[in-house]
Amino acid sequence: MAAAPALKHWRTTLERVEKFVSPLYFTDCNLRGRLFGASCPVAVLSSFLTPERLPYQEAVQRDFRPAQVGDSFGPTWWTCWFRVELTIPEAWVGQEVHLCWESDGEGLVWRDGEPVQGLTKEGEKTSYVLTDRLGERDPRSLTLYVEVACNGLLGAGKGSMIAAPDPEKMFQLSRAELAVFHRDVHMLLVDLELLLGIAKGLGKDNQRSFQALYTANQMVNVCDPAQPETFPVAQALASRFFGQHGGESQHTIHATGHCHIDTAWLWPFKETVRKCARSWVTALQLMERNPEFIFACSQAQQLEWVKSRYPGLYSRIQEFACRGQFVPVGGTWVEMDGNLPSGEAMVRQFLQGQNFFLQEFGKMCSEFWLPDTFGYSAQLPQIMHGCGIRRFLTQKLSWNLVNSFPHHTFFWEGLDGSRVLVHFPPGDSYGMQGSVEEVLKTVANNRDKGRANHSAFLFGFGDGGGGPTQTMLDRLKRLSNTDGLPRVQLSSPRQLFSALESDSEQLCTWVGELFLELHNGTYTTHAQIKKGNRECERILHDVELLSSLALARSAQFLYPAAQLQHLWRLLLLNQFHDVVTGSCIQMVAEEAMCHYEDIRSHGNTLLSAAAAALCAGEPGPEGLLIVNTLPWKRIEVMALPKPGGAHSLALVTVPSMGYAPVPPPTSLQPLLPQQPVFVVQETDGSVTLDNGIIRVKLDPTGRLTSLVLVASGREAIAEGAVGNQFVLFDDVPLYWDAWDVMDYHLETRKPVLGQAGTLAVGTEGGLRGSAWFLLQISPNSRLSQEVVLDVGCPYVRFHTEVHWHEAHKFLKVEFPARVRSSQATYEIQFGHLQRPTHYNTSWDWARFEVWAHRWMDLSEHGFGLALLNDCKYGASVRGSILSLSLLRAPKAPDATADTGRHEFTYALMPHKGSFQDAGVIQAAYSLNFPLLALPAPSPAPATSWSAFSVSSPAVVLETVKQAESSPQRRSLVLRLYEAHGSHVDCWLHLSLPVQEAILCDLLERPDPAGHLTLRDNRLKLTFSPFQVLSLLLVLQPPPH
C-alpha cells in the first residue's frame, strides 16, 4: 500500500514535533515521557539542619533524623544535610541508573567522602549518574550525602530576584528516587529540539529550514516511544541531516564552557565557596565524559578558597588544567569593578592573580576576562600590557541603554596609546545554553561581519554558578558542521583569540574608555563602602612606603610582606564588581565593612611599627614625627595632639616622601604666618574667609555666593548663582535599584534651602578660619557642615556630616562656575580624561552621570575651577555646573543601603591657567593623603629627611613597595606615572642606598635592556603621556 501523503502544513507540522518532545503535554505517550524508565524510591532518607556551613567530615558525624519527600527545611542561609541510602534493583543490570533529586536550594552530592556533582533545579541538574551501565558485579547498595544550601542560584530575594533576601523562606524536597535513564531517548530529544530550532530560526524563506522541519516530522513518523527498536531509524534520519556540511566560508563559533560566579552578590562570600565547589565539580564530571570539553575559569580568589576548603577537588582541577580542559583565565584576583578601584589597586589585581596562576598552574593567563562589570577604564589597556596580557573578553556593553556599541571584535586603545584585542561574544551573553537560536544570533548580531569570522560562545548557567550541562554539550557537538549554520567547535579562549589575531588587519579601533550606559548609580550607592575603599587604598600605600623606607635604613626591620599580602587581598576582594559598587545584599556589605576595619586596624599597627624603625637611633628630643607619604614638599596646617587630649594648630613643613620632627606637644605655639586667615561675619549673617590666595563668601545659610582668586580678582561662581547648593532628586529606576539612576531623575531637582541665621563662625582665623551651619534636608534627614580655609591653602574644604534616612532619593551638591567649556576633565586611574559638558548626541547625554576619582575640573583658557573629594566617585558637569553625587537611598537588594551617619569632605579650588600648572592633581592627593603625626620614639630624629623626590610636577611617584620575588633580596619597586598628558624627562632623586636600578613591568619582571645609570643619587626617566613606569631598585646591604 502506498504511503500516506505528507501534507506538511508549517504550523501543524511544527507543533506536532513540539508536542512530541514537550515536558508538559502528552507525556504519557510522547518521547519526553520515555526519558526515564523504571524507578524506585531511595531505601532510607534522613537529614539534619544546621545554620553552619560544615565540612563534610564534621557533617556526617551529626545526628540524622528520618526524612521524606515533601519535607520542608530552612530558613534562608541554613544548610540541610541528607543521608541517602540506595539499593539498586537487580533487574536494572545493563541499564544507566540515575539518582533523581529535585529540591529547592542548591545541592552538592558527596560520594566516598568527596564532592562529585552539583544538583540544582534552576541549573537543570536534577539527576546524578550512579552508573553508565550497571554491571553484574557492581555493588547494589551505597550511601550518598546531599548537602543542600538554603538559597537558590540567585539568592533568596523576597518577591523578586534583586529584593532583599527573605530570612524566613522555607525550602522543600520534592523528588528523591532511583530511575533508569534512557540515553538514546535523550539523544533523540536533543536532535529533535535542534531541528525545531533550525526550522524556526532560519524561517519560512529558507530551504534548509523546511528540510529541518520535514526531517523532524519524518522522525516522529518512524519513532514509536513505546518501541525502542524504532529509535535507530529516527537517529539515522537526524544524522543524515546534520551530516550535510556547510562551505568553507562559514562563520566559526568557539564554544567554551563557562560558569560566571559572582564572588558575592545576592549571597554572602562564604556561600560563594560552596557555589564554586558545586559548579566546578560538575564541570570536571563533564570533562571526564567529554574529553573535548574545555572550561574557562577566572578569579584566583575563588580557586584559593576551593584549595583551602576542598583540597581533593582542587587536586583534580589541577589535573584537568594539565590536560588543557580546565583553563584558568583573567589574570586577576577577582573580576573587579572597572571604574572605582585606583590604578595601583588594578595593578595589584593582576599582580596577585597572575602570581597565583603561575604558582598553582604553571603559567600566567594570556587573556583578561571580565564579562560582567559596569564599565572599563581607559587605563586598562596599559595595565593589561604591563601584566603580560594583550587580549580582553567582556560583554557587558551589550546592556547599554541608549547606544548600541558598534563592534564585537576590535582593537582598544587606552589613554597612553596601548592597544589590546577585544572580543565581545556577539550572542550578548556569557550564559548560553547551546540552542540554535543563540547560535544564529551569534552570527546575525555580529557587528564586525566581513572583518572577523570567529566568535566566542560561552555556555553554562552563570551569575550564581551552575555551569554547563551534558545537554548543552550534546547540542553543540551535534552542530559542529551543519549546512545552514555556522561551524561550532569546542575551543579555548587561546584558540579563539589566536584565530582572531590571524585575521585582524581590517579590525577597527576604539579609543578611550568603554563607558557602560547603565548602572550609573553604582558610583554612589553604599557610600560607606566607597569611603572604606578610598581610605584603605591610602592606608596600604602609606604602610608600604614607610615599611620600604624602614627596610632600606634598618638591618633589623622585617618587611611585613605576608601581612600586607593578606590586607591587599581583602581590599581586592572588596573591589569585586558587586561589592565596591554597593549592588549587594546587606550581609555582604557588612562583611565588606569588616574587611575594611581589619585593614584599618592592622594597617595602622604596621604603620606605627615602620615609623618606629624608620627613625630609630637618630638623636633628638621626644615628640612627634610628621610624615609626608606624597612625592612633593608640603607646607600645611595640622592639628597636633596636646596633653589631656586637646589639639593645637601648627604650620608644618615636611619634605617629599619623608619626615620632619616636631617639638614636644607642650612647647607647641601657634605661630602666625605673614598672611594669616581672616574671618569676618557681617551683620546680615554672611561670613567671609580670606587667606590671601582665595576669598570665600558664604550667605547666612551656608551657600557659597563668591569665590575669588585674590591675586587676579577673578570670580569663580557664576553671576547670580550660588555654590555649595545641596539638591535632592527623586531616584526611582526602571528595575535595577542599587545599580541605576535614570536620566529622568534630573527632571525632579529640588534645591535644599536652609534657614538664615544658622551660619556661625567656628575657628576665628590665624592659621585656620572656619564657619559652620546646620541644614535640614527633609523631615528625616539633616546635615552639618564646617567650611574650612587654611593658611597657604589654594582650596576651601567642606567637612560634611549627614544623618541620612531616605527612600529612593539622591543627594548632590552643585557649584555653578563662571567658566565656559565644552569639555570637563575627570581624574581616572593614573591620569585623566575629558568628557562633554553638553548633550549634543545620544553618546553625550547617555553620560549624564559619570565617575571620577579624586578631582574633576572645568577650565577655559587662563582659568578654571576644580572640585576635589576624599571618598566620592559619582559626578557630572552639565553646562557650567559642577555636581558631586553624595548619597543615594535604594532599597534593593539591601533595604538598609546608605541609611545612617556619613562623613566626607569635598573641596573647591579656583585656579589660574591650566589645572596641570595650578597643581590641582597635587592638591587632590594632599586632600586624600593627610600628613601623619606619629609618636616619635626616644630619641626622635632632629632633622627632616626625604627619601624620594621627582624634578617634574608632571610625574607622580605613586607607589613604593618591596619587590614580590625573593623577599630575602633587598629590593624595592617604585611605580611612577605621567599625570599631565605630556612628554617629559625628569630626575628621580634618591636618598636610599641603591646598588642597582632596572626598569620592570607591572608584574615586577626586569627588562633585560632596562638598566638605568645612577648619577649623584639621581635617575633620569623619560615619559610619554600617561605612561606608567615601574622601577626595580636593588638596595645595598645595610650597615650593621
Curated annotation (Swiss-Prot):
Subcellular location: Cytoplasm
GO CC, any one term: cytosol
Active-site residue numbers: D372 (nucleophile)
GO molecular function list: alpha-mannosidase activity; carbohydrate binding; metal ion binding
One of the protein's GO biological processes: oligosaccharide catabolic process
Highest taxon, organism lineage: Eukaryota
PANTHER family linked: ALPHA-MANNOSIDASE 2C1
The name this protein goes by in its record: Alpha-mannosidase 2C1
